[in-house]
């Protein structure tokens, strides 16, 4: 998928680009919406930032917006690989948080209805309940085991892996990788247009170093 491999594994994480419901300010969750035209363009810009890296494989969630972002990244990289290539895996463990009864509702209208404290609890809290949906803690409970089983062994073997997921599934993984305390999770963000790069040694289950790369975009309603 051209920094060549060294003894260190590399995990590059990207949030999907702007989706149709991001543009509208709606809680999307498991609703399978497409990228906007702007999002598709920005995904190719992300790919341009990764032309120096030779990936051994890629992972996305089961949802179209991550698959379409990966397709754009591949296009931007000018890589000789297709989105149905055997090196690419899609899995629901990486899906966005299920927002339950809030799915499809405008975030800012809900904020006006319930107040800022409850809104921030729902949006950024660690174990804040959402009627019919998931907490971030529950997302962590599915993302981390999948990472440890499917992705970590490849990183420890020195492979370079690209992961395209969602704001909350990435935040959950960041908690694990960076040892972030539960009480600090409200401050953890995964911005659009940002690439997180974690480097792994063969004997380590957690990254030793972290870098970031960014494209210059106008962020949508996260």
PLM segments and residue spans:
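Short glycine-enriched, charge-decorated loop/helix-capping segments at active-site entrances
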Residues: 26-34, 105-107, 136
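Short catalytic helix/loop segments, enriched in acidic residues and glycine
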Residues: 29-45
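Short polar catalytic/cofactor-binding loops
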Residues: 15-20
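Beta-strand elements within well-structured catalytic alpha/beta cores of enzymes
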Residues: 10-14, 59, 89, 159-165, ...
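Phosphate-coordination/substrate-recognition cap region in phosphate-metabolizing enzymes
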Residues: 3-6, 44-119, 175-199
């Amino acid at each position: 998928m051209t920094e060549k491999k060294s003894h260190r594994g590399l995990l590059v994480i990207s949030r999907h680009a702007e989706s149709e419901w991001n543009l509208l300010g709606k809680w999307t969750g498991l609703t399978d919406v497409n990228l906007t035209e702007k999002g598709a363009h920005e995904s190719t810009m992300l790919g341009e930032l990764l032309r120096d890296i030779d990936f051994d494989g890629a992972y996305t969630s089961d949802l179209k917006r991550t698959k379409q972002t990966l397709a754009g990244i591949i296009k931007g990289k000018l890589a000789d690989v297709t989105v149905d290539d055997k090196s690419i895996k899609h899995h629901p463990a990486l899906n966005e948080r299920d927002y339950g009864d809030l799915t499809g509702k405008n975030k800012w209208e809900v904020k006006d209805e319930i107040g800022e404290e409850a809104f921030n609890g729902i949006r950024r809290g660690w174990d804040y309940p959402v009627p019919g949906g998931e907490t971030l803690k529950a997302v962590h409970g599915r993302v981390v085991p999948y990472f440890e089983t499917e992705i970590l062994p490849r990183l420890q073997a020195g492979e370079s892996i690209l992961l395209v997921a969602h704001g909350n599934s990435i935040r959950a993984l960041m908690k694990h990788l960076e040892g972030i305390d539960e009480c600090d999770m409200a401050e953890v963000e995964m911005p659009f247009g940002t690439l997180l790069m974690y480097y792994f040694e063969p004997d380590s289950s957690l990254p030793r170093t972290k870098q970031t790369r960014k494209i210059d975009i106008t962020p949508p309603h996260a």
